[in-house]
Swiss-Prot record:
Function noted in UniProt: Involved in the anaerobic metabolism of phenylalanine and phenylacetate. Catalyzes the oxidative decarboxylation of phenylglyoxylate to benzoyl-CoA and CO(2). It can also react slowly with 2-oxo-3-methylbutanoate and use different electron acceptors such as benzyl viologen, methyl viologen, FAD or FMN, but NAD seems to be the physiological electron acceptor. Also catalyzes an isotope exchange between CO(2) and the carboxyl group which proves partial or complete reversibility of the oxidative decarboxylation reaction.
Alphabetized InterPro entries for the sequence: PadG, PFOR_II, Pyruvate:ferred/Flavod_OxRd, Pyrv_Fd/Flavodoxin_OxRdtase_N, THDP-binding, Transketo_C/PFOR_II
Comment on pH dependence: Optimum pH is 8 when measured with benzyl viologen. Half-maximal activities are obtained at pH 9 and pH 6.8.
Induction trigger: Induced anaerobically by phenylalanine, phenylacetate or phenylglyoxylate.
Provenance organism: Aromatoleum evansii
Annotated catalysed reactions: phenylglyoxylate + NAD(+) + CoA = benzoyl-CoA + CO2 + NADH
One BP term from GO: response to oxidative stress
Subunit field text: Dimer of heteropentamers composed of an alpha (PadG), a beta (PadI), a gamma (PadE), a delta (PadF) and an epsilon (PadH) subunit.
Coiled-coil regions listed in the entry: none
UniProt gene name: padG
Protein name: NADH-dependent phenylglyoxylate dehydrogenase subunit alpha
């Protein structure tokens, strides 16, 4: 093969040049939705999600997204409308947060039970009382047992890319479950940064033939019962209910490998990659580590770099996929770690610790060895998790290596800010 022919062949396989823009996280999410070519969106605005659905509406109005849009009277109706669209075979999308997510709680559970591959962006917002419209993970964490896949984004670019991938993950025949793309309210929703837009033709090739709801799409020639009344003590109700739940669990576990496959395909076609389940940062020779979720990871990586320069053998573990929880990937990441500090942006009231810390304790148990650990809670109601905050986490976690006793209570990072 001549040099010219070889160069042409390499160029044909290389990702095409991408348009570069400055975009906020909410706009990046909307652009990712447009690239995935949904058939139907239904929306209701709520801070800090509002500008996202405004961007979606404008893309449709400008002819840049060919989708039907339904302006419903509230979030309960938003998701109910999309269930009907999905049952008819449409690719569907919405976004919400906080009280809006609470309002759609009933159809939210029904969506996963009916195995409808709807993509819903949660622009994460802290809980109410005392009132807050600022960022926090409490809303998303509150619904983590509702059968939805949940992935968390660190950057605006990751928001766009993950949004596109979410549709392919949800619609995979081994998964068929709805997906939450979670981005931090305020920090990512309104934070602007450089974003590369992949070519639409490349994304179309990546998405492939649409295969939405082949299992439940309504068809007069194939009648079926949708969401039947089950349970009780007579007939086959209990068995039917168990089959539904078992199928959801199977789809959730299948999602782990599918998420990895989809991320690998995206990296190959687009030329940009993100850790699909768990990101290991400077962990190869680390003696201890900190764990992060979402946008706090940027500041945490800077703090880890500074600590490394000071001679500390510290690494970082970022959880990208929270549901299903990546047990095996996390076991591998924790393989050589001797102490761990986990930073949550929400509260697990039952166990008096962060929800991610609670999940991690289960993984530590499965490791079969004791790793001293500390639960840190910070960034509530829009508070900053700064580099100095992370240095505190690093120093206190390192102290566990030298015999310090881990506190039995969570450490509240912003208590005295």
């Amino acid at each position: 093969m001549s040099t010219a022919t070889l160069e042409k062949a390499v160029a044909a396989k290389a990702p095409r040049k991408q348009k570069v823009i400055l975009a906020e996280g909410n706009e990046a999410a909307a652009l990712g939705v447009a690239l995935a070519r949904p058939d139907m969106v239904s929306v209701y605005p709520i801070t800090p999600q509002s500008s996202l659905v405004e961007h979606v509406a404008k893309l449709i109005a400008d002819g840049r997204m060919d989708a039907d849009i339904v302006d419903a009277e509230g979030e309960h109706s938003v998701l109910s409308v999309l269930q009907g669209g999905a049952l008819a075979g449409a690719r569907t999308y919405t976004a919400t947060c906080g009280p809006g997510l609470a309002f759609m709680f009933e159809p939210y559970f029904r969506t996963s039970g009916m195995r409808l591959p709807i993509v819903l962006t949660i622009v994460t917002r802290d809980g109410i009382t005392p009132q807050s419209v600022w960022g926090g993970h409490q809303d998303a964490m509150t619904v983590r047992e509702a059968g939805w896949i949940q992935v968390y984004c660190e950057s605006v670019q990751e928001v766009l890319d993950t949004t596109v991938m979410a549709f392919k993950i949800a619609e995979h025949h081994d998964v068929m479950l709805p997906v939450n793309v979670c981005l931090d309210g305020n920090y990512l929703s309104y934070g602007a940064s450089r974003v590369e837009l992949p070519d639409q033709a490349v994304v179309d090739e990546f998405m492939g033939e649409k295969n939405v709801n082949w299992h439940v799409a309504l068809d007069p020639l194939r009648p079926m019962a949708v969401d039947p009344l089950t349970g009780g003590t007579t007939g086959k109700g209990p068995q039917t209910f168990v089959r539904y739940r078992k199928g959801q669990c199977r789809g959730m576990q299948n999602a782990l490998s599918v998420i990895e496959e989809v991320h690998a395909d995206w990296a190959k076609r687009i030329g940009r990659s993100f850790a699909p389940l768990v990101e290991e940062y400077r962990l190869d020779d680390a003696e201890f580590a900190i764990m992060t979720l979402g946008s706090m990871t940027g500041a945490a990586k800077d703090a880890v770099d500074e600590a490394r320069e000071a001679g500390k053998k510290i690494g970082l573990i970022k959880i990208k996929t929270f549901s299903p929880f990546p047990v095996e990937a996390l076991k591998k990441a924790l393989g050589k770690v001797k102490a761990l500090g986990v930073i949550d942006r929400s509260v697990g009231f039952r166990w008096n610790c962060g929800p991610m810390y609670q999940e991690t304790l289960g993984v530590l148990y499965r490791l079969g060895r004791h790793i001293p650990s500390i639960s840190y809670i910070g960034g509530l109601a829009g508070a900053d998790i700064t580099i100095p905050h992370v240095h505190r986490v690093i120093d206190e976690t390192e102290a566990l290596l030298n015999g310090a006793v881990a506190p039995t209570e969570p450490v509240w990072l912003n208590e005295k800010d």
